């Protein structure tokens, strides 16, 4: 199995059973390294050099977060701003994201139909996280899948386990 770094950002994890289920899965498996940004950087002072060095040690990445006010959590946005280095775009500089698989897992309390052109918010999740998608594309990462868990706060334990199993099967493809 590929050595996987999970970059996880949820400012209110204690209120998210869906995210906790996946976090517990990552912690129990040796091929996954979980980095909870809100746990690691409660003061929002990111050690960018250390993070860049860490990225080089992994074969693939999972970026997991909830939609908060129609975007990524602020600490994740800051992490990307601080860690992603424009020098990686130069030919003679190692780009730790180039060619690496990236899986994005997004949870939201909203209904799927609300996140559509004709829905309540008139924007899709892909549009709301487009900054992340563009950043990963510029740095030549391979976005393998974007998993969206709608109404995550209303899922039963059984539905959460089914969502987790579905995501695990995507990782194993």
Residues covered by each model-derived region:
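N-terminal beta1-alpha1 ligand-phosphate binding loop
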Residues: 1-35, 167-168
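A short helix->loop->beta-strand "cap" motif at the edges of active sites that frequently abuts
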Residues: 2, 97-101, 141
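Hydrophobic/aromatic beta-strand patches that form the interior of the parallel beta-sheet core
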Residues: 5-7, 33-35, 62, 103-105, ...
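Generic recognition of short, well-ordered alpha-helical segments
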Residues: 17-21, 46, 74-78, 158
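Glycine-rich phosphate/pyrophosphate-binding loop and the adjoining helix
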Residues: 23-27, 129-173
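A short beta-strand-loop structural module common to alpha/beta enzyme folds
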Residues: 29-45, 150
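Helix-loop-strand module that forms the ligand-binding subsite of alpha/beta enzymes
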Residues: 49-133
